[in-house]
């Protein structure tokens, strides 16, 4: 075999001490196929940009990377309900590179399987280019791209110096992405948050792309928008980036996806290639169902989703899907458990890692309870999904029976409203008002939005999209 040679594209940039970060000498996106290896008998190149996107089917509906939540079983379920691309949970690059036990816990034989789990993007957090490359090499052949997490806003990311806490260190971000771009056999992508200043965000996005990122996902929240200050993602800044980046940029939008028709609206208003959902997907896997399909498929029965998901988990090898199961069950059943608090207590007692019989008991309880509901003579009048008037933000709120999966609207201004919501769910006959529908503030203009407290089920290790 002839001697292998590597050919790298050198991208020049000037590091500035200004807060806006590096100033690119070539601000337009530089997209050139890098030859990975070349010998007298063969050559190999990796797809980039639009060609890569088209090779995986031009996906439009994407499961976001979520810590301990976008694991294999959940990805399989989400694909059945319309997801066309999935990201893994965020993996810690140094641990993935150096700890066999960590890899075994996080990555199993079915992960990235061509028949079960593709297309797939594997996400890592990192602050060391060498560890990132070592980690990424473990998943070559089992994914379509590797993503760098530049969005995690949580305290653990601050302490570990990764995620959104690299946003001011453009030199390091460039080196992390470019290391994979020039030395890894699969493409690299990136997911970012925004700065308050849209021009600074645009320069940031250009730098990420020039480093070699083939897809750019923009989460329209700043690093500070978390916990009590979560608020809404700003679609206007996402659209500004889309309009001002090269048109051939493969561009995904993330944030504010509550219903299937929000995906259609986002694609149209922003002009993005695809829409990513995190929390919306966790509470209702049907969020990825086409908005033109039957409403009852867009908002599936909780007992049906629970049984389907549980059967998938039982089949999946490894521990990752089992560890995540309890959290998923709480989210899928959230509106149901507000009414049937006895079953909530049973869910809380489950040991999902070692005791499948605990889960089976809960699944059967939920199935029996929902069957009782559907045995009522007036079920056709009760099992109705209705939409309110069109709002200024372009969509409308939906009134969904509590036995169907639906988005979770966090209480606002410190008022939980749990009792009011529960009574509304029980009656299914009350009109939509600000008293029983606290989500009415969710789509206010950016400067009018109230602060929103954390999800009650969020643990110290955040389960949100990062």
Locations of regions flagged by a protein language model:
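Active-site beta-loop-alpha junctions enriched in small/polar residues
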Residues: 66-68, 91-93, 125-127, 151-153, ...
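Conserved beta-strand positions in the central sheet of alpha/beta enzyme cores
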Residues: 87, 121-123, 147-149, 217, ...
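Alpha/beta enzyme core
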Residues: 137-146, 150-160, 171-249
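Short glycine-enriched, charge-decorated loop/helix-capping segments at active-site entrances
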Residues: 161-167, 227, 292-296
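Polybasic, lysine-rich low-complexity intrinsically disordered segments
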Residues: 4-5, 23
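Intrinsic-disorder-associated, low-complexity terminal segments enriched in Asp/Asn/His/Tyr and depleted
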Residues: 8, 13-14, 18
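Alpha/beta catalytic cores of nucleotide-metabolism and tRNA/nucleoside-modifying enzymes
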Residues: 2, 11, 26-31, 36-62, ...
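Glycine-rich, positively charged N-terminal anion/phosphate-binding segment
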Residues: 45-57, 66-139
